[in-house]
Curated annotation (Swiss-Prot):
GO cellular component entries: plasma membrane
Chain segments carrying region Disordered: 105-147
Record note on quaternary structure: Forms a complex with MdtI.
Alphabetized UniProt keyword annotations: Cell inner membrane, Cell membrane, Membrane, Transmembrane, Transmembrane helix, Transport
Lineage, uppermost ranks: Bacteria, Pseudomonadati, Pseudomonadota, Gammaproteobacteria, Enterobacterales
Family: Belongs to the drug/metabolite transporter (DMT) superfamily. Small multidrug resistance (SMR) (TC 2.A.7.1) family. MdtJ subfamily.
Biological function: Catalyzes the excretion of spermidine.
Annotated organism of origin: Yersinia pseudotuberculosis serotype IB (strain PB1/+)
A GO MF label: antiporter activity
GO biological process entries: glycine betaine transport
Keyword Phosphoprotein: no
Protein name per Swiss-Prot or TrEMBL: Spermidine export protein MdtJ
Amino acid sequence: MIYWIFLGLAIIAEIIGTLSMKYASVSGEMTGHVVMYFMITGSYVMLSLAVKKVALGVAYALWEGIGILIITIFSVMWFGETLSPLKIAGLVTLIGGILLVKSGTRKPKQPNRHRGNRPPSVQGLKTQTTGHHKGVAVESGEHHAAA
């Protein structure tokens, strides 16, 4: 859970840093650059902590994707940037991509283990040895090296 918090903090720091960069370029104030340097550095530090347990592809997709989405919204509100139909389509596609990448990280269901310790592919096979052929024990369709 803490690694997801690190990822959230990385996203927030990236958003603040990038918006500070835009603010500095529009206003000419050095404060924006100073905030940008600290926030972007903090963002990478938090991201590096997050990827210890969060899959890199997922972490990076969320970090960049959510960052782009929120930065675009604030750029329209604060800096008067335009939001064309193509940009909106791109953002919708971005959201879909983030959801697909995130859903691809779900752990597969564990197979039923109540039938014994054999893998599911051989659970239904009989285990009676039917004979030996050239040093190989033949067990109902399975071949095992004879001891």
